[in-house]
């Protein structure tokens, strides 16, 4: 039997249950005689198209490629759901009394203000960790410079 490419496009309207338009491109074998080709066409029309079913939602597809693309969408959904669960789990496991890394405030307090330097002060700048609640009231008042200079 001689196989020469003979493509045909089968179109069918969607039924009321299945709202998908069936556009199936089929490569059918053709033979030398027209009578045998007509018999192969009639037998291929009687054959049921192969149906591929999704394991997750039971949706039906007429090609394995379409099913593969559809299952990739399910894979993406599962990946996003997993990441969301992991993020939620990690945020719940952090102890509320423990600060997050790098959440403490670090501030520079220098004794090198211009007025202080003019009066003979040193340029010693020190970094110290400030508690989350801020400075004590007495410490805050002692570091506050209210002088105005032009």
From Swiss-Prot:
GO molecular function list: DNA-binding transcription factor activity; zinc ion binding
Compartments, as annotated in UniProt: Nucleus
Coiled coil regions, renumbered to chain: none
GO process annotations (BP): negative regulation of abscisic acid-activated signaling pathway; negative regulation of floral organ abscission; regulation of DNA-templated transcription
Record's keyword terms, sorted: Metal-binding, Nucleus, Zinc, Zinc-finger
Entry-linked SUPFAM superfamilies: beta-beta-alpha zinc fingers
Gene3D superfamilies: Classic Zinc Finger
Zinc fingers typed C2H2-type, residue spans: 52-74
Domain of life: Eukaryota
Chain positions covered by the region annotation Disordered: 120-146
The keyword Zinc appears for this protein: yes
One annotated Gene Ontology cellular component of this protein: nucleus
Keyword Nucleus attached: yes
Primary location group: nucleus
Tissue-specific expression: Highly expressed at in the abscission zone (AZ) of petals, stamens, sepals and siliques. Expressed at lower levels in stamens, carpels, cotyledons, major veins of rosette leaves, trichomes of inflorescence leaves and stems.
Note: Plants over-expressing ZFP2 fail in the abscission of floral organs (sepals, petals and stamens) after anthesis.
PANTHER family: C2H2 AND C2HC ZINC FINGERS SUPERFAMILY PROTEIN, ZINC FINGER PROTEIN 3-LIKE
Protein function: Probable transcription factor involved in the regulation of floral organ abscission. Participates in processes that directly or indirectly influence shedding of floral organs.
Subunit structure: Interacts with DOF4.7.
Name assigned to this protein: Zinc finger protein 2
Species in which this protein is naturally found: Arabidopsis thaliana (Mouse-ear cress)
Gene: ZFP2
């Amino acid at each position: 039997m001689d196989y020469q490419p003979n493509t045909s496009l089968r179109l069918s309207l969607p039924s009321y249950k299945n709202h998908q338009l069936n556009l199936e491109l089929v490569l059918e074998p053709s033979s030398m005689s027209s009578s045998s080709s007509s018999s192969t066409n009639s037998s291929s029309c009687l054959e049921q198209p192969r149906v591929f079913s999704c394991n997750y939602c039971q949706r039906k597809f007429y090609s394995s490629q379409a099913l593969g693309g559809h299952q990739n969408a399910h894979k993406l959904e599962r990946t996003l759901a997993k990441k969301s669960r992991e993020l939620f789990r990690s945020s719940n496991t952090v102890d509320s009394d423990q600060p997050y890394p790098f959440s403490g405030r670090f501030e520079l307090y220098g004794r090198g203000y211009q007025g202080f330097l003019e009066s003979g002060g040193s340029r010693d700048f020190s970094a110290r960790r400030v508690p989350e609640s801020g400075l004590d009231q007495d410490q805050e008042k002692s570091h506050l410079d209210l002088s105005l200079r032009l």
